[in-house]
Amino acid sequence: MRMVDDYKMVLHNSAIVINNCSPNDFPTLSRRFHIYDPVRHRLDPLGIYYDQANRKLYMPRGIDVDFVKRKVQTSMEDEFTSTVVHNHQYGYVTKKIGMKKRPRDDTQMEALKFVLCKDKYQRNSGKSQFGINLNTGGGKTFLCSCILSYLGIRSIVITAQSGILDQWKVRLQEYTDIEESEIVKIEGGPMISRILNGTSTLANKSLYLCTHSTLQNYGSTHGWDKIGELFKKLGIGIKFFDEAHQNFQNMALIDFAARDVWRTYYVTATPSRSDRQEDIIYKLYMKNVPSIDLFNPEVDPHTNYIAIKYNSCPKPADVNACKNSVYGLSNPPYIDYLMRNERFWVMFDYIFSLIYKTGGRALFYIGTNAGILKVKQRILFNYPELYNDIGIYTSISEHKQEDKNKKYILTTTKSAGAGEDIAHLKYSVILAEPFKSEVLARQTLGRTRDPNTTYIELVDVGFKQLIAYYNAKKPVFSKYASGSKVMTVDNPKLANLGEETRLSIRTRFRNVLEFNVHGPIDAITYVEGPKMMPAVYFGNNSLNRTLAE
């Protein structure tokens, strides 16, 4: 009887394995999964993995099998053999999980039929990979909860950040009646080792949560075959990749290591990569993976896009200092330049004053931690009463999760990127973190989930690279924003805005207590004598109190 390794090509649920080979055996096939690194001037593999010790090439299951077969056959002199592996060994949840909520609309109901292969989607019941490409706020976590409840198969959720795992746990307990003890967060290599050694009591739970970095660190240290053993030990039958477009290579390695897991769901609102080369390979990776995208341009857009163009008037030396020979513009020196540019601060004061007057929570994107601290200082200088309302949501904050609940949040696109759930945001402001990526544009647009919200982008036309960034993202906002508006601030208008803001702040500080004190104040009562005396004096006589015995 033939063993699996005796076949030249083996089809698993989430991988194609070519045995006894070298990547040089079929260069045209291998080259399609390599990208050029302009910094190190070399080709790096992406979406594939070659096990040199065992002479095995791992490729994505979503590509055309016949195409791979032809390429492998042309490199062989011996007979070509292949087989399909159906090794579905998984565990079930320890207790039936019920749903607390029903699908909120027809869109969620249609998506639910897709993920469970019901009605017209029954043809996908033999598939092992599915793409859930719903828009931000479309209920992707709810659908995954329904999958766990309906199928009752042990599952694992894999995300980029530990904080996102906490969001998953909260949402799963909100949508289902799963017991908290049945949700296990896998943290660190020692915990994985205990599970593999059989010395942990956590190997028979219903749902596991883990980050890409935890699995990547353990796999690169102990071998990726250990990740496959981990999934078998836990009885994992379903794996969910949250924000599947991120950590692409790591996701592929997990797919290859845990290639016999029954089903894999790739969950993302933006099934694309920012880099063009990487996006081509990502699309190839997902080519034959059935997916669903129910975006409705008549109903789903809910955030208005406003581009505010101004000229920071950089000197030639400033432009040269911000240049990058590979990427065109280097963000850190550009942001440092903005922090020293008076025109930028005029625009910031104007934008912040509008948000302050209209009310509502706001998220500001600033590309560096140094820039974030400068912006915070500026706000506190002009609005000292907001000391407890400003949060920094990056690694420099000791209370990062608490700061995410503040009224005004200063962050970066990396810290508050894909998958972040920040409730009741009214404004998202791209203040000092320019980017060209259409994927990032959709992600940042998706941070405001409530209706009638606003997305503001400050565009510095003094740099030609930033004009190109703005033009590259326009199609995204045309499609996914509820409306688009462009506001141009020329030099005279900018001067007027600066004067208006200066006078407004001056007026605020003239009667500072009127801004900082809300309602009547009970002054101190003195009982030393019968004499009537004013105890506390304010700049405004209406706030004075006369105190009696």
Across the structure, where does each feature detected by a protein language model lie?
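Conserved pre-motif I regulatory segment
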Residues: 82-130
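Conserved interdomain linker/interface between the two RecA-like ATPase lobes of SF2 helicase motors
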Residues: 292-355
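Conserved RecA-like P-loop NTPase helicase motor core
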Residues: 395-476
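Conserved two-lobed SF2 helicase motor
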Residues: 203-220, 404-417
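A conserved SF2-helicase RecA2
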Residues: 454-509
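Post-DEXD/H (motif II) to motif III coupling segment of the RecA-like Helicase ATP-binding lobe
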Residues: 246-300
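Conserved Walker A/P-loop ATP-binding site and its immediately adjacent core
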Residues: 152-174, 369
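Walker A/P-loop
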Residues: 124-147
